[in-house]
């Protein structure tokens, strides 16, 4: 019985799951929005939110903890240089999940997961000149 076992298995072994969420966390930190399946997005929240909370206080120990969890130097740099200061006044809830329909091949529910205070992307073109 799997009573009181938290987290989703996602039909993967533990090392595959750990590597997948490590890669997805790095992608989310670098791009600030990614598209994935809904269960993966919900589980990714549990990985990324503590990393951003860790980045709010910049110290060598916290940087080493973040590197141990992501294994990516660029991700750690962006976490502590950009995201930590950006979310300094926010007490949790750094991500948002937006459902976006179903995948064509297998009808899996898809979702965007994004950082909430993401800078607005300019949609203006060069035709305004």
From Swiss-Prot:
GO terms for molecular function: structural constituent of ribosome. InterPro entries: Ribosomal_bL17, Ribosomal_bL17_CS, Ribosomal_bL17_sf. GO terms for cellular component: cytosolic large ribosomal subunit. GO terms for biological process: translation. SUPFAM superfamilies: Prokaryotic ribosomal protein L17. The keyword Cell membrane does not apply. Keywords: Ribonucleoprotein, Ribosomal protein. PANTHER family: LARGE RIBOSOMAL SUBUNIT PROTEIN BL17M (PTHR14413:SF16), RIBOSOMAL PROTEIN L17 (PTHR14413). Belongs to the bacterial ribosomal protein bL17 family. Part of the 50S ribosomal subunit. Contacts protein L32. This is Large ribosomal subunit protein bL17. It comes from Actinobacillus succinogenes (strain ATCC 55618 / DSM 22257 / CCUG 43843 / 130Z).
